[in-house]
C-alpha cells in the first residue's frame, strides 16, 4: 500500500510506477475512512467549503457529543479517526486533490458548494476538475444525501442526473429563488420545501451570521 499526501500528483512518475507494480495507492482520506466507525459528512466545492465545514460541525456538535471536524480547517482526518465510534460523526472538508485517491470512501451525506475554474495546473482540464469534484458521490446510495447549489450551472444538471439514475438523494439549496424541493432563502427566512409544501427552518435575524453567503 502506498499512501500519498494531497500535494503529490497522481500522474507523477513515482505514483505511476507503484500502480504499474500493482500497489494500491490511497490518500489520507481513504486511509482514515478505513478506520472510521461512525458516519461521515463530507463537504467539497471550489469556494466556501471551510466555512461550511465549520458551521456544519457546530450544528452537528450541538446534538452529538462525539463530533469531529477535520480537513484543512484544523486537524487531519487521520489524527481524529481513532476516536470514532458507532455513534460519532466526522464532518470532513475534502479537496479535489483528496478526492482523486478515494476508493471506498462513502459519506452518509455530502455537499458540493459550487464548482468554478480552479487548480487546472493539477487537473489539466476543467472537465477533469469537475469529474473529480463529482467523485464525492461515487459510493453513495439512495440511503444517502448530497446537498448542492441549485444556482450552479454545473451542479444543477449533475444533481438531476443523479436523481434520474436513482444514485443518491439530492437536496438543492438556493438564495435566489423559492424551490419546490430543497432549502431556500427568501424574505429573511430559510425554508425547506418538499413537493411544494414548505416549512420554516429559521429566520435569519435569529442567526448570528454575516452575509447571505453564510446563510447559504
Where are these regions (language model features)?
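Adenine nucleotide phosphate-binding catalytic loops in nucleotide-utilizing enzymes
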Residues: 124-127, 164-216
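Phosphate-binding loop of NTP-binding sites
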Residues: 6-150, 154-169, 184-185
Amino acid at each position: 500500500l502506498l499512501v500519498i499526501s494531497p500535494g503529490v500528483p497522481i500522474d507523477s512518475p513515482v505514483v505511476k510506477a507503484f500502480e504499474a507494480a500493482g500497489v494500491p495507492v490511497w490518500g489520507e482520506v481513504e486511509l482514515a475512512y478505513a478506520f472510521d466507525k461512525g458516519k461521515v459528512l463530507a463537504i467539497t466545492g471550489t469556494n466556501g467549503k471551510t466555512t461550511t465545514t465549520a458551521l456544519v460541525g457546530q450544528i452537528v456538535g450541538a446534538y452529538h457529543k462525539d463530533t469531529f471536524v477535520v480537513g484543512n480547517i484544523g486537524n487531519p482526518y487521520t489524527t481524529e479517526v481513532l476516536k470514532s465510534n458507532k455513534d460519532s460523526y466526522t464532518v470532513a472538508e475534502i479537496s479535489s486533490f483528496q478526492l482523486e485517491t478515494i476508493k471506498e470512501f462513502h459519506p452518509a451525506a455530502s455537499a458540493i458548494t459550487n464548482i468554478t475554474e480552479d487548480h487546472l495546473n493539477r487537473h489539466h482540464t476543467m472537465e477533469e476538475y469537475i469529474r473529480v469534484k463529482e467523485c464525492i458521490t461515487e459510493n453513495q446510495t439512495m440511503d444517502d444525501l448530497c446537498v448542492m447549489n441549485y444556482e450552479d450551472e454545473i451542479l444543477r444538471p449533475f444533481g438531476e442526473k443523479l436523481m434520474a439514475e436513482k444514485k443518491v438523494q439530492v437536496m438543492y439549496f438556493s438564495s435566489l429563488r423559492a424551490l419546490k424541493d430543497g432549502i431556500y432563502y427568501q424574505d429573511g427566512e430559510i425554508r425547506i420545501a418538499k413537493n411544494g409544501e414548505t416549512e420554516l427552518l429559521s429566520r435569519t435575524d435569529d442567526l448570528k451570521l454575516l452575509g447571505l453567503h453564510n446563510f447559504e
